[in-house]
């Protein structure tokens, strides 16, 4: 027989049914009921459990596990496998600087994080001419040279010491310290802007160290077997009132009680904060005074919010928020580090003012099926001792709404956005209807790649305030988002936008956004500029960004972005026909 024929016969024999190994027809399948404890999901009934042996072998004997079964700690398991420990490598073996094993004792862990955030930006936007001096003495216009370049470096360091388990149970104690080292270099075309003194020139270079976190967190108790808990946190701490930073996102000093219930389905925050004075140029907390009390503003925020997962839809989290802002900064004027008046704002009557405003809000974030959805709505009410243009008490009544819906199509995510903030239609009456936040940092409509959100657009010729502040979406007419007071006599905003994210590769993402912007009401701008009419159409905000992650992680992130505002009639009424734009490069290195 040939070798080929033998191979064919062997293949046929291997493929034929192994009848000799089949169980006899009278062989039954033996099942053994299990009587011991059974793991089950909360709220689900316990069903009968049987083990059925189909291979003709005697079934294994089932029995309960012992009451206590010793399992080695994870760091001992990793060490026994022989992985090397290198402090500079956060991923290999046990790294004591990353909390992989105890730093001392049995359950004291230490964690260090270092982030270098470097940004270079070149931009052109409306820039006022200095009152006393100019780089172009022959110019007659109130709008000067638009060119601006800046380099900003932030070294964010974080040191955490905590006691307790590191998996399911919250730590018993946590001590956190977050110093940030800043260097800023700015060069403008005009004098009298980097500093109020025009002899300071057109360039400013300086550094600053801010404390963005310094707190202790004490775990008070566990309230369920699934580690629902209550904790209290005291000190300088980060806080966000909602999902996207529309109302209040800051690092104030305060006390916060927080916790969870029903297997983390309910979450709550109850807190009282006093805001900290900021460094003018870096925006970081400034506690360089004699003690912390000198650095605290007479500006208090009381916050309560409640989260519920899977409400009203599976995968969608709802939140209700009640936030009160009490401001009593009317004693004396406040001059910022560059010599400019910040409180009260240099607009309208320019009188010191106080206010009490309460925000009642609903926020939601999650998905409904394949549709990703974020919504936010606030109603602000209260009173202020004097309005911006009237030296008399005014009642605050204003609203805000934002929504962003998106859907994934394979490697593409398409987005649609709408934002509405009410404006004041009569700046001389006894009502303030323009919505303003406490300290916003919105993550919507392109966020800081959007021109209108990223840039400080000054109201030239109507007071030393900005139509739209830096990293802010609201047209609030404030001199400074970080140091100024809220202003409820403003033109408001209407935004409608489309955008898309393209995950070209796991390392490369392309994002595009196009937003149409309008003022809600223009009466306050017309009063400030003594100019009428001013059209509502601000223009089209177009932005493009590329994000590259060479390690497919957040350790190295390079971002390039370009944005521009195509002027609408309202923008041209204020600033002329020039098209403002911004180009930036951002590099983040994280350890």
Residue map of PLM features:
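Residues on the lipid-exposed face of transmembrane beta-strands in outer-membrane beta-barrel proteins
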Residues: 93, 100, 114, 155-161, ...
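Outer-membrane beta-barrel channel domains
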Residues: 37-40, 92-103, 128, 134-280, ...
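N-terminal periplasmic/intermembrane-space "pro-region" immediately following the signal or transit peptide
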Residues: 18-171, 410, 414, 426, ...
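Membrane-embedded beta-strand positions of outer-membrane beta-barrel proteins
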Residues: 112-118, 175-179, 232-234, 268-270, ...
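C-terminal structural cap/anchor segments
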Residues: 418-421, 425-532, 536-537
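Short loop/turn motifs that connect adjacent beta-strands in outer-membrane beta-barrel proteins
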Residues: 82-112, 123-127, 162-175, 220-230, ...
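Predominantly the C-terminal beta-signal and adjacent terminal strand-loop region
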Residues: 421, 441, 550-591
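Signature for the C-terminal beta-barrel architecture of outer-membrane proteins
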Residues: 226-228, 237-432, 494-496, 503-504, ...
